[in-house]
C-alpha cells in the first residue's frame, strides 16, 4: 500500500490550490483523487469571464482559471488519479478508492483534505463521527 503525506479528494480549484500550496510548504508526497475525467472541477463549465482577479491579477474564464491551477500541479510533479471514486476513509486515514485501471485500491494518508466542491455533502452525510469534530471544515463554513 502506498503512503502519502497528503491525499486530497477532489481535483477542482480548491483541491488543486491546496495541493500546490502544500507542495510549496514542504509536503512532498501528495495524491489528488478526482472522480471526473479531467482536473478543474466545475470551472470547466463556467465559460464566462470574472475568475482570477484576486489570484492571477487578470480576468479569466473558468476553463482558463482551471488551467492555471492544473499547470501549477503539473509543474510541481503532484500525482493525481482521474476517473477514481473514493469509497471509504477510515479513522486511521486509510483511503479506499476504485477506478478501471487499478480496480479497488487503498492508500495510507498522513492527512486528508476533502475538496469536493459544489457536490459536497453535509458532515452527517459524510458519516464523520462527533458533533463538532476538530479540523473538519465544509464549504458552508464561509457562509
Regions found by a protein language model. Name each.
Residues 4-64:
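Beta1-alpha1 glycine-rich phosphate/pyrophosphate-binding loop at the start
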Residues 1-9, 67-143:
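FAD-binding core/adjacent interface of flavoenzyme oxidoreductases
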Amino acid at each position: 500500500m502506498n503512503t502519502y503525506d497528503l491525499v486530497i479528494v477532489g481535483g477542482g480549484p480548491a483541491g488543486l490550490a491546496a495541493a500546490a500550496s502544500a507542495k510549496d510548504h514542504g509536503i512532498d508526497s501528495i495524491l489528488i483523487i478526482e472522480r471526473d475525467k479531467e482536473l478543474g472541477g466545475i470551472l470547466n463549465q463556467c465559460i464566462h469571464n470574472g475568475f482570477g482577479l484576486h489570484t492571477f491579477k487578470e480576468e479569466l474564464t473558468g476553463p482558463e482559471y482551471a488551467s492555471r491551477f492544473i499547470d501549477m500541479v503539473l509543474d510541481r510533479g503532484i500525482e493525481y488519479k482521474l476517473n477514481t471514486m473514493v469509497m471509504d476513509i477510515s479513522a486511521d486515514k486509510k483511503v479506499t478508492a476504485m477506478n478501471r485501471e487499478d480496480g479497488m485500491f487503498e492508500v495510507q494518508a498522513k492527512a486528508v483534505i476533502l475538496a469536493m466542491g459544489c457536490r459536497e455533502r453535509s458532515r452527517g452525510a459524510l458519516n464523520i463521527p462527533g458533533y463538532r469534530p476538530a479540523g473538519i471544515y465544509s464549504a458552508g463554513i464561509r457562509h
